[in-house]
Amino acid sequence: MFQELAILQELERNNYLTVSNIETIYGTSAGAIVGILISLKFDWTTLNDFLIKRPWNNVFPIHVQNILDSYGKRGLFDIKTVEKAFKPLLDAKDLSLDITLEDFFKYSKIDIHMFAFDINQSKTIDISHKTFPTLQLLTAIQMTCALPILMAPVCIDNMCIMDGGVSCNYPLNNCISSGINIDEILGIKNKCSEHPLITQDSTLFDYIFGFIYKAIFRLNTDDEQQPIKNEIVSDSNNLTIEILSNALKNMEVRRELFEKGTNEARLFLQNSGQEFL
């Protein structure tokens, strides 16, 4: 998420795009969060300070009691965590915590599509102001970010909805099939360059996350995706409790992720034959 925002910021700084002109966003999990953050229409300095300097370990605590409580909640975190994370941003824009997707669209004028997966029916869910107009924005965020163990799934209308990464990690084809001009699409695709081995020293969480990411990798749809000229491949690490904990606790780790995203944007501009500022 930090890398993606830094990429967009650097591209705008170099006049490659204008974020305020974005009309439609397709994203899953962290990509969906990036879309929401952009749609809130903060300036980059305010948004960067919020994301880098906020003590996120207080919002997403990882301790023994938290782990024990997860058994009944089906996850370490739930809607209360999402509310705590987004409340300062929504308050700053005089938006309610209960704002619906329809009302958020009226505010942002951006057509956001967030992708999740319904376990009960084994199908991908496209969450937008068109498909779920009365759904609360924060519930939609929980749905697309409900990675097993970390975030509790959302159970409504006979559906059990979790993170869409297992079926639609990079919704490029969904975006193209909607009829959007392919030359006007900017894609930011995450690629994991390292796949840590599960060993005798691995924890239960390492084992579960390792399995999830292997499953996502096996379901990779790169070969089925239409190539686009405006695509940035962002190098990311597989999520582990250690990586998550470090990013939540350490401001410098978050700064490094921003810097990594900035460098990826510059490399893209360089390869595109464009000078950067």
Where in the sequence are the language-model features?
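Patatin-like phospholipase
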Residues: 1-28, 33-277
